[in-house]
Amino acid sequence: MNVNVSNTAPIQYKRYVRNDFSKIHQMTAYLAMFPPNLPYFFIKHYSKINDIVFDPFSGRGTTAFEACRMGRIGIGNDLNPLAFCLTKSKVNMPKEKNIYKRLQTLKQNYQKISIENISEDITMLYDETLTLPQLFYLKHSLNKANKIDNFILAALTGIMHGKHRKNGTSMYCSIDMPNTFSMSPNYIKNFIKMHSLTKIKQDVFELLEQRIEWLFRERNKPFENLVNYRKGECFCLDAIKCSKKIMKKYGKNSVQLIVTSPPYLKNIHYGKYNWIRLWLLNEEVKNVDKTVSIYHKTQSIKGLKDNLPFESYASYMQNLFNSWYNILKPKSYAFVVIGDIGTQNLAKDTWQFIQENGGCKLNLINILEDLI
């Protein structure tokens, strides 16, 4: 296994400007994501066209999409239904013209649906004469199993909420609020009262059309074009189970490269901070936060004073790394981005734990520190 091959790798990937990459990467903001120039560097130097590139914790699909864009078979996996929706939309992209065609059909068939039974947590965010009825219609009309509908849903998650411009207009559907994550309903409710926030009447179909146009807009930069794009795949499984799935579908030792960032040791509530987007996807917040964890049994333990959370994390990572032994090709690489917690060097501590508790089938080449 390779966490970093050369001492210059952290510097080299930063030569590529993150804003020069395809806007598809920016479809929806996502917590704890790394920039596209990072996987681009590793994909460029440690794989070739038609190779399989895998990310078992794909998040919004940065590694998997960049691999597909570069002519590789990008495979993503994530238990978070929002992450699954986003990654799937990027590794199995429909044609732009087909997206517009579907939007036109949805617009023509639009009929206002009663919003009487929608929770106040949602109604406080949106205009109730046009915006919320349209959102509710799309929520019930779009089928996540259909790749065109899934892409539209993914794009819509990116404009569900966000900031307003100084002139009072917005590219988002909601009141003036952050875009990256959602504060709690009670916090938002009090914030609305405190700042006298008002809802703006937004045509969701128009916003979606503008968003789609922006996502596919190219500026003739090499990191944006989709000329070499090829279809990939996405799973919604536990990461270790996904290794077995890949071996079954693609064969033993079929993966050339892994670039991933496991969930932080300090638990991030992906459901809680995305409750508005999960409402759109018909997903329950509690179920997401219960499922999206690599150490379920330590959810109730807060802080890092007790060793149990770390040991559970490190033990899981050991089993995960060993599962990669069967899917990685000989002389292939796995780059693992691990975020430190406070003063703890999590990467080094995890590897030391693994070595002291049975070892790993993969070889560690290097551990380098870098600020992303």
Sequence positions of predicted segments:
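Class I S-adenosyl-L-methionine
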Residues: 342-343, 360-372
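SAM-dependent methyltransferase catalytic-core segment centered on the flexible catalytic loop
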Residues: 245-257, 263-330
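SAM-dependent nucleic-acid methyltransferase catalytic core
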Residues: 135-260, 265-268
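Conserved phosphoryl-transfer catalytic core
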Residues: 82-145, 283-300
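S-adenosyl-L-methionine
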Residues: 1-49
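Conserved S-adenosyl-L-methionine
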Residues: 34-38, 42-111, 199-244, 257-287, ...
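Short glycine-centered segments of the SAM/dcSAM-binding site in methyltransferase folds
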Residues: 52, 331-335
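Short alpha-helix
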Residues: 319-323, 346-358
